[in-house]
Structures are given as structure tokens and as C-alpha cells.
Amino acid sequence: MQQRYILALDQGTTSCRAILFDHQAQIVGVAQKELTQYYPQPGWVEHDAMEIWGAQMGVVREVLEVHGVKPAELHAIGITNQRETTVLWDRHTGRPVHNAIVWQDRRTAPLCESLKERGLEQQVRETTGLVIDAYFSATKIRWLLDNVPGVRERAEQGELLFGTMDTWLVWNLTRGACHVTDYSNASRTMLYDIHRLAWDEGLLEALDIPRSLLPEVRPSCGSFGTTHPEMLGGAQIPIAGIAGDQQAALFGQACFEPGMAKNTYGTGCFLLMHSGERPAVSESGLLTTIAWGIDGRVEYALEGAIFIAGAAIQWLRDELKLIDSAEDSEYFAGKVPDAGGVYVVPAFAGLGAPYWDMYARGAIFGLTRGTRKEHITRATLDALAYQTKDVIDAMGRDAGVPLKALRVDGGAAANNVLMQFQADLLGVRVERPPVIETTALGAAYLAGIAVGIWDQAAVAHQTAPERVFEPSMEDDERDRLYRGWQKAVRRSMDWERESDGGVQQSE
């Protein structure tokens, strides 16, 4: 029998990638192409949607050619994508009306403030699980309607379509036959009712967005059409799985039960915890989001972001010059048994969940004459683990379920000193997978399950960790260290706020 493959399309913020998986979920090949970033004004970030489409098809053809795989040997395609990034295009010509507005773009912050002033915060929170923020798609759509000449009129006449990047890719792969998205991506638009599983008419009216723009929403694992015969040499390949990047990573890490969580240690951290088949309401400023829809079920997650994670290690390297490479942090941190009472609070851009203090600033506490660079390096690594515990504890309270295990990915997950301290601090196992491509793997699993290659039980069985870090710290020691962290955070908070007739700030 000929080998059959699953193709994962990973449409990210900085690149388009195509990853070929075999039936054992092993990577056969990867192709990647960087994307141009456009910054037309400070705080604005755009992509050329046509460049994304061209780059995505280019890497698909490259990975197939390099590895001698015929399109007909593809069992299915799965798609994962940068979330929230917004494009509007003409349904007849397929041409975008403007560059795509990227998730990081802040141009709609004033519009968000006006929505808050209109008293919409509670409605948005209760309906979508999100907070009003420029991050999400809704205000990006409204900006395009209001600021690109002729777009509002064309939208109201039904000539235009909206999509996040998954929708844009499927529409092009099917030559306009399918205008669809999945539950996970829809839940990031700030327009989707995550309880009723429908676009919310009240929010569409409040934002003055025509309903005709929006795609059909389908379960994450299922049918999203087939590729048009002209796309891949006559082959019609089922597009069978879609999930936003962070939800795809949660699936790729097989976090299928409430209380299972994944943390991606990148420049910042993205933490998601599976919270069950009912949405958990957060009292800590975490986001409630749809994890995925599969087998007639919808499952939910809580999401929290840490602003500064790997960026703190880069700071040690680039600004303080304490280390020559990020990898050196493990070597120096491992030369001391602990941080020697030192705490680094990397609040360079304020603090996110659960503190939400934009006036907090970075600080180092507990310095003595005996403090060496090894202690400061160790304390900086420890800060990633402390911030993760802050968010995980908030998730446990909000979801009403304790953490079962933390599965990790991203660059800093390779740091053994950090991973052991993370396990010690949380008091649960930290599991690191052998495949670091967990986002693409999640998309491949969703597609493979839809076409009958795997089931969720098989996926759970396949995701044996490469290494498990077991907690070995005494409870008293864990509590003592964490109390010190909380004290350090309290003293970092509110640093930049005006007080006593002047501005409290560091030079």
C-alpha cells in the first residue's frame, strides 16, 4: 500500500510553512517562506494577503517536490493560522480591498475606547468571552469599512467577504467554493457568541458590520471543502481540520481533559488550559475561548498571555551582557543551587494576567554583596516559572479544576533548569514533547481524525513526552519562594503612575 500523508499549512505571523506528516505523525518534511511586514504608521502592522496566498502555495509545492510526494498521496490538509488577522476581499475577483490588518496592530484602540464608553464591555465579555481590545478582528473590520473608500457601500451590497487567514486560504484553495471558518477562529473575532455558537446580531449591530461579510462557522474537525483540481495537479484533497495557532498547539499537545494545559515559551508566553464542555468565566482577566469543535462536542479553554518571557533572557544577553547566547542561561543558572534570594520582575511593559498593571516596571530585588551573575541569570529564568504559576493558579480558580499536567513547547522549553524549577513551583509534572512543531501537529491531527486515520485516543497515546520533569521541592520551600515573588511583584506595581505632584519613575 502506498504511503499516505497529511499536509499541515501553518500560516504564521512571520512566515508561511508547509509541514508533511506521515501516518505515525512523524515529520517527513518542512518548507518555509518569510513574510514581508508592513508598518505604515507607528502601531500599525499589515500583511499583503496576496503575498500570503502565494507564499503558502509556494511552500506546499516545495515540500511535495523536495520529498517526492505526489498530491494524490495526500490524505487530507489541516490548516492552522495566526489568529485575529483580518482581510476583506471582493467575492467576484478575489482581490483584497486593503492589506490584511495583523493581530498586533493597535490602530483601533480609540474605537475600542469608544465601545467601552458606550457600555459594551459586559455584553462583549458575556457573549464572546473576550475583552474589548484592538487585538481582535471586530474593530479591524469596522476600521476597513470606515476608512477605505467605497468599502462600506460594497460590503452593504454583498460584494465583499471577511476572513481570518484560515478563511482566506480555504476560499483560495477551493476557488471560492467555500467561505468558512472554524469555531476556534470565530471565537477570536469579538463577534461570535461562544454559548449559542452563532454570530451575534447585537454586536454586529453595535459595530455596524454587515452580516453578509461573515463566513459559515464549522467544527474544527470535519469538512471545509476540497482543493480545486487546478491547485494541486488535478488532485482534490479534503481540507479537513482548522484551528487557530494556540488552540492547535493545545490539540497537538493532546490536552484533551479539563485541567490539562500547555505553555508556549516564546518572546512572551501563551498559556491555554482545557476547561471542559462549558465556558469558564474568568474573574482574573483571562480570556474564555473555544478550544475546538469535534465529534459533535465543543470544548473550551482559558487563555492567558505573559508579556515578557524569552525576551527577559534576550535582555540578559543584549542589554546586560551577562551571557553570550540564550543557551548560556542554562549553564550559568545551573552553577548555583538557587537564585540566592534574588527576584527579577521583568515588567518591562507592565504586567498582564492576573495583575493587569500597565504602570508596573521591571525590578531586581534581594541583591547582596554576594550576588553573582549566576544568581541574576537564575532569578531571570525563575521569573518565567513564577509568571506561569501566577496564570495557572488563576486558571485553576476560574475553571474550578486543578492543573493536571503542564505540557510545554517553544524555545525556552529546551532549558532543563527552567523546566525543573517550573515543575517544582507548580507541584505537577512538566512534560516536553519530542515534536516541537505542536501547532502544525495539532492541525494535522484534526485533519487526520476527520478522515479516519486517527482518533483522539490514538492521538493521546502517540504524544508520549520526550522528557518528564517531576516536582521534587518540599511544599514549605515552594510556598516560601512564591511568597517572595508575590512581595517582589507588589513592590514593582504602580511604579510609573503620577503621585505626590510628580511622576514616580525610574531614569
UniProtKB/Swiss-Prot annotation:
It comes from Halorhodospira halophila (strain DSM 244 / SL1) (Ectothiorhodospira halophila (strain DSM 244 / SL1)). Inhibited by fructose 1,6-bisphosphate (FBP). ADP binds at residues 13, 17, 267, 310, 411, 415. Its EC number is 2.7.1.30. Pathway: Polyol metabolism; glycerol degradation via glycerol kinase pathway; sn-glycerol 3-phosphate from glycerol: step 1/1. This is Glycerol kinase. InterPro entries: ATPase_NBD, Carb_kinase_FGGY, Carb_kinase_FGGY_CS, FGGY_C, FGGY_N, Glycerol_kin. Key enzyme in the regulation of glycerol uptake and metabolism. Catalyzes the phosphorylation of glycerol to yield sn-glycerol 3-phosphate. Signal peptide: none annotated. It catalyses: glycerol + ATP = sn-glycerol 3-phosphate + ADP + H(+). ATP binds at residues 13-15, 267, 310, 314, 411. The gene is glpK. One of its GO terms (cellular component) is cytosol. Keywords: ATP-binding, Glycerol metabolism, Kinase, Nucleotide-binding, Transferase.
